[in-house]
């Protein structure tokens, strides 16, 4: 697991772009079709994929996240905000 996230992922904008691409891969969608304000469940992210997204976040950013992240923060914007705050506390 990485101890320091890539510098490019430290801004909220870059986190949002990275998350959008990551989630688009899981739901088999074009990243431009995902609305960052729309609940991820509506975009097709199920519980199995949500846990996989959490594992990818942990591996890439080097911070632990709860497997309920996508339900506690149900949009790309909300997750990016949460992660940005968590990274700032490191």
Question: Can you say where each PLM-predicted feature lies in the sequence?
Answer:
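Flexible, low-complexity inter-domain linkers and amphipathic docking helices that mediate domain-domain
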Residues: 1-90
């Amino acid at each position: 697991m990485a101890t320091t996230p890539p510098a490019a992922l430290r801004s909220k904008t870059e986190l949002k772009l990275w998350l959008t691409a990551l989630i688009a891969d899981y739901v088999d969608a074009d990243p431009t079709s995902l609305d960052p304000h729309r609940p991820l469940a509506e975009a097709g992210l199920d519980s199995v994929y949500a846990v996989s997204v959490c594992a990818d976040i942990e591996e890439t950013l080097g911070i632990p996240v709860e497997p309920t992240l996508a339900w506690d923060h149900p949009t790309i914007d909300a997750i990016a905000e949460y992660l940005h705050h968590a990274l700032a506390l490191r």
